[in-house]
């Protein structure tokens, strides 16, 4: 009896009701923290005395009620009786109390009796007696019906929960429908039967949807507290840590609380910027929706390139935007640019274009700027922040412009505003005694002159007045906030400001090792104020406890402390990490970029993590800034040689420890079990043996394989000796060339359920494709 009573009371616990509220300001007994309720109906810590005074002034002019965590109307506004403002509230001494779990108002057993007013058990409000139902406890027929429907829904929810907790019971028991045979006419009874049948259809539909979303829900439940433990709360956490949240006023509009809900739906089509090639606009599809964030998929490409953005991101646009503004749209894979048509494509895909009203950037007020397309400037290379290079403005949209580095490919381009700290006027490097990286191939690097270069390129410098100074961000050390985890972008975690500089902050994820800290721009859309997740409906990952760090490997199958087995360093989201080599949080992957082939060119990044990802340093090595780059290149080369020598030595020692019966068997085993970590081109004997064992693979580069369709991958698998029957498996799983190159031996054996022998041949063919790609680059 005691347990049931406590559980019942726990269900109806409301954090708002335990606070002391006065003039719109709530205080927690035993605490000095003060709270207010913002426009979203959620709690917000008051950190400024002026802010508290504003709350009191605003409350003095309105009739205030105790708020709810999720303000949801119990019935449509049109169904409620329209009372004068003075009556549409709770009388003094009887505030409206809402459930924190459901967001619905509790039924008050003993409402305050007020002469001339009738209390409604559904609305928990008071209205004129004349306008309420005669002799009833409801203000309207809709309110009475709502209470009845709510009771039935609660019964069904209880039965569904029981079925999910005990699958065996779900096979034995069928959901019961409460059919109340009151004294009604035959017509009313038939109406009830129809309503009950409709409820059954809705119930079955929700069960199917639940099964379909099981994968995502399992991930989202990671943030839910275990049974018997209290739910994590920002207010309690701040008090325990004696910490303060970053004031909401320090966040930019695109970081702060949104004004509208996220209206995007899965399957909607739109146009947007490729974050890895920011000069390229692509056809995108909404793959997932979570709170105020959406996950976007490049049509026709592997889902390993999917990326998350906020619903109000400036880089997404409605269908037809590129055609309207004169921008080039990159069509889906397999479509020709001149043949692509949005209307035809939407009909073919049976898809819906995202409504224009969902795009917040359609109503931006454009501020006059001194920048024009073609103007020159000096800009920081974000991929190598120590480099400041010669750059050009190549595009302008609203209040932003695209920075392109002269004579480099577009993968280094980025969008920025006039106040960006990454851009400087012509001559800034000379004035501040910084080295300016000149365009590759430019003659007379040591005597580079801006005047001469501007004349040669027939261009103008961006005027100094066009560059705006960004004010200090105001973030301070030890302040708390919510940050998107760049290593696993589906997660937003509780974080602390570990350090600051002029325009960046170093974030630390609470409970995690300091090695995961990283710097991020203070105006990045991936940082948010405390409470952003709760207000937008996005799961927030609470700080890791020492116990969770110990138990992580048991639950997630990954040995990395803190990792719950979600996310993958080398491929798409649905393949969880099976080892430290694949875990985005493992030590070996800590400072690496994800190993994906370039989406447009199909080229793989350098195999060795010692080499910088970009080509600019190597290409410009002999032409500009020799003091900086030559030293950097020597360090890289020395590190690479040490790693290679160590790996080769380890490989030879391992081979020497095992003696095979015959030379032929030794050659065969070495060819089959060769690891891609060893530089294959440096071992001609091994390369020769692999080519003999897999003749259909020799000479095919990975860039060509990445463009294969699912049918071509299937045909290739069938061409391998002993793998004829496995081609259909790859076709059924819709594995194209890009996905094929990202597979590991473990994936082929465990996920594809292919025996070890054929799996080794398939995996070695992948290694040979990559080696052939590397050979072709070396020859060039």
UniProtKB/Swiss-Prot annotation:
Record keywords, A-Z: Chromatin regulator, Isopeptide bond, Metal-binding, Nucleus, Phosphoprotein, Repeat, Transcription, Transcription regulation, Ubl conjugation, Zinc, Zinc-finger
Spans traversing the lipid bilayer: none
Cited InterPro entries: Mbt (IPR004092), PcG_chromatin_remod_factors (IPR050548), SAM (IPR001660), SAM/pointed_sf (IPR013761), Znf_C2H2C (IPR002515)
Comp. bias (Basic and acidic residues): 643-661
Residues covered by region (Disordered): 149-220, 597-665
Localization annotation: Nucleus
Zn finger limits (CCHHC-type): 549-593
Domain SAM per the UniProt entry, residue ranges: 708-772
Single GO molecular function: zinc ion binding
Protein name (record): Lethal(3)malignant brain tumor-like protein 3
Annotated source species: Homo sapiens
Protein encoded by which gene: L3MBTL3
């Amino acid at each position: 009896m005691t347990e049931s009573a406590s559980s019942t009371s726990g269900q109806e616990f409301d954090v708002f009701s335990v606070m002391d509220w006065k003039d719109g300001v709530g205080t927690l007994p035993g605490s000095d923290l003060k709270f207010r309720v913002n426009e979203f109906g959620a709690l917000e810590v008051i950190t400024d005395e002026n802010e508290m005074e504003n709350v009191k002034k605003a409350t003095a002019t309105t009739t205030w009620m105790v708020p709810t965590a999720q303000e949801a109307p119990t019935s449509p506004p049109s169904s409620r009786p329209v009372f004068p403002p003075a009556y549409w509230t709770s009388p003094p001494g009887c505030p409206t109390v809402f459930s924190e779990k459901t967001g619905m108002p509790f039924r008050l057993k003993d409402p305050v009796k007020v002469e001339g007013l009738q209390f409604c058990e559904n609305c928990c409000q008071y209205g004129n007696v004349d306008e309420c139902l005669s002799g009833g406890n409801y203000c309207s027929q809709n309110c009475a019906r709502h209470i009845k429907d709510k009771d039935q829904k609660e019964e069904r929810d209880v039965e569904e929960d029981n079925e999910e907790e005990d699958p065996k019971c779900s096979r034995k028991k069928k959901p019961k429908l409460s059919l109340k045979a009151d004294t009604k006419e035959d017509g009313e009874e038939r109406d009830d039967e129809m309503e009950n049948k409709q409820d059954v259809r809705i119930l079955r539909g929700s069960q199917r949807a639940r099964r379909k979303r099981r994968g995502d829900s399992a991930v989202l439940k990671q943030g839910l507290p275990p049974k018997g433990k209290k739910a994590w709360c920002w207010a309690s956490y701040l008090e325990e840590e004696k910490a303060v949240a970053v004031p909401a006023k320090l966040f930019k509009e695109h970081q702060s609380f949104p004004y509208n809900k996220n209206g995007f739906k899965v399957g909607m089509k739109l146009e947007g910027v490729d974050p890895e090639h920011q000069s390229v606009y692509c056809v995108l599809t909404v793959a997932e929706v979570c709170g105020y964030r959406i996950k976007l998929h490049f049509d026709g490409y592997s889902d390993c390139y999917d990326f998350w953005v906020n619903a109000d991101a400036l880089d997404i646009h409605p269908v037809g935007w590129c055609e309207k503004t004169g921008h080039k749209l990159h069509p889906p894979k397999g479509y020709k640019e001149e043949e692509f048509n949005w209307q035809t494509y939407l009909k073919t895909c049976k898809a819906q274009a995202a409504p224009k009203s969902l795009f917040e950037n359609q109503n931006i007020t454009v501020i006059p700027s001194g920048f024009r397309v073609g103007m020159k400037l000096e800009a920081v290379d974000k991929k190598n922040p120590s480099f400041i290079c010669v750059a050009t403005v190549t595009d302008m949209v609203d209040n932003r412009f695209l920075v392109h580095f002269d004579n480099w490919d577009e993968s280094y381009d980025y969008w920025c505003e006039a106040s960006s700290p990454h851009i400087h006027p012509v001559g800034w490097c000379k004035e501040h005694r910084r080295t300016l990286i000149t365009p590759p191939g430019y003659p007379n690097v040591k005597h580079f002159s801006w005047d001469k270069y501007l004349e040669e390129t027939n261009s103008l410098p961006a005027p100094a007045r066009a560059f705006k100074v960004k004010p200090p961000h105001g973030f301070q050390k030890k302040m708390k906030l919510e940050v998107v985890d760049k290593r696993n972008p589906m997660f937003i975690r509780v974080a602390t400001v570990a350090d600051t500089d002029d325009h960046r902050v170093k974030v630390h994820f609470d409970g995690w090792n300091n090695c995961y800290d990283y710097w991020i721009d203070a105006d990045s859309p991936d940082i948010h104020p405390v409470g952003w997740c709760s207000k937008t409906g996005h799961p927030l990952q609470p700080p890791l406890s020492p116990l969770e760090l110990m138990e992580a490997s048991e639950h997630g199958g990954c040995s990395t402390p803190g990792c719950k087995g979600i996310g993958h360093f080398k491929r798409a989201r649905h393949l969880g990490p099976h080892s430290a080599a694949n875990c985005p949080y493992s030590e070996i992957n800590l400072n690496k970029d994800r190993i994906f082939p370039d989406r447009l060119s199909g080229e793989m990044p350098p195999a060795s993590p010692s080499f910088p990802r970009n080509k600019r340093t190597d290409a410009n090595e002999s032409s500009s800034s020799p003091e900086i780059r030559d030293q950097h290149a020597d360090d890289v080369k020395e590190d690479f040689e040490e790693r290679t020598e160590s790996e080769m030595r380890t490989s030879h020692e391992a081979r020497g420890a095992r003696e095979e019966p015959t030379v032929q068997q030794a050659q065969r085993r070495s060819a089959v079990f060769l690891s891609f970590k060893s530089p294959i081109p440096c071992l001609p004997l091994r390369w020769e043996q692999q080519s003999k064992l897999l003749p259909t693979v020799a000479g095919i580069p990975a860039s060509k394989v990445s463009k294969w369709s699912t049918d071509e991958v299937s045909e290739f698998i069938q061409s391998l000796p002993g793998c004829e029957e496995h081609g259909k498996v790859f076709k059924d799983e819709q594995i194209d060339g890009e996905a094929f190159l990202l597979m590991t031996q473990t994936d082929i054996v465990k996920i594809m359920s292919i025996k070890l022998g054929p799996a080794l041949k398939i995996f070695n063919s992948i290694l040979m494709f990559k080696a052939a790609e590397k050979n072709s680059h070396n020859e060039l």
